[in-house]
UniProtKB/Swiss-Prot annotation:
2-oxoglutarate binds at residues 318, 320. This is Gibberellin 3-beta-dioxygenase 1. It is an enzyme of class 1 (oxidoreductase). Residues 225-327 form the Fe2OG dioxygenase domain. GO terms for biological process: gibberellin biosynthetic process; gibberellin metabolic process; response to light stimulus. It catalyses: gibberellin A20 + 2-oxoglutarate + O2 = gibberellin A1 + succinate + CO2. Its cofactor is L-ascorbate; Fe(2+). Catalyzes the 3-beta-hydroxylation of the inactive gibberellin precursors, leading to the formation of bioactive gibberellins. In vitro, converts the precursors GA20, GA5, GA44 and GA9 to the corresponding 3-beta-hydroxylated bioactive products GA1, GA3, GA38 and GA4, respectively. Involved in the production of bioactive GA for vegetative growth and development. May possess 2,3-desaturase activity, catalyzing the conversion of GA9 to 2,3-dehydro-GA9, and GA20 to GA5 (2,3-dehydro GA20). The keyword Oxidoreductase applies. Pathway: Plant hormone biosynthesis; gibberellin biosynthesis. PANTHER family: 2-OXOGLUTARATE (2OG) AND FE(II)-DEPENDENT OXYGENASE SUPERFAMILY PROTEIN-RELATED.
Amino acid sequence: MQIMTSSSTSPTSPTSPLAAAADNGVAAAYFNFRGAERVPESHVWKGMHEKDTAPVAAADADGGDAVPVVDMSGGDDAAVAAVARAAEEWGGFLLVGHGVTAEALARVEAQAARLFALPADDKARGARRPGGGNTGYGVPPYLLRYPKQMWAEGYTFPPPAIRDEFRRVWPDAGDDYHRFCSAMEEYDSSMRALGERLLAMFFKALGLAGNDAPGGETERKIRETLTSTIHLNMFPRCPDPDRVVGLAAHTDSGFFTFILQSPVPGLQLLRHRPDRWVTVPGTPGALIVVVGDLFHVLTNGRFHSVFHRAVVNRERDRISMPYFLGPPADMKVTPLVAAGSPESKAVYQAVTWPEYMAVRDKLFGTNISALSMIRVAKEEDKES
């Protein structure tokens, strides 16, 4: 495997941040995507996961495989109904009319691209550290469990730590540092406010909005305690994109995720009966919303999480910026019975995020769904 290096520092030098990142076992050694003329065996993925064998759906005339588009500009009953329909039938949708300006989205995308264009040693100064949780540049810990590597670079950080975190990348705290941090802070502020607006629409769609409604207190508590994480992805162009995966098929574990993607399409949602992948178009100004597992639990299965993956392009790089929203670690996510089950019974056990992640981690590499493991057994199941 070829290691990405800058012209200024040897990767074998003790002073090289890239060498230090490799030595600490947290950040993987990075393949030089830019100079790749072929795909090395370490990145050949196609067909490894059973979901990867599902075909990619072609656009059909009746729009049956067109990803739903929700316009929230009016915030009216029609928009709420569209949110409910998309979350029930797809688990993901394109969001327009959200109020975040195209200029603001362009600024944050440009800054993400500039980060990934830095020399490898500069990026490696921000490498994930032992005991540093899920923060830093490099491969997220859960991806290291796959036998193959993804065709991607990534950087994860909690919004409150933006300025401290990126002083590692730009230790001189110069103009580049301030421009980057300002763009990320603007993105955080916009997504946080948008998340609260969308949460209100979700609860209204469930018929649980308002302080006097069955879910009113829950909505207020969730809104006031939402936690967030930003993950920047770069999916470089690839000489043989059909043999690699940008990001393996998965569901998000939290409540819901906003994804800003560049105009180059690459995100795909899994549809069933029959299984097929549907590509989300790169619609300028739109954000993608993906429902997560814990929102699936909270809504008692009415709004379902969706498997999604990222594929790469032969000619163009692709930027993707997920903004993850979820509960605090100590909050028990309890199904809102009135939201989903016609029998008015909880379909899932109440669970904290760490408890749920422990179940997911235990089932990694199997075909068993973590949601199925916290499902409350029906009476007929108990008797069989």
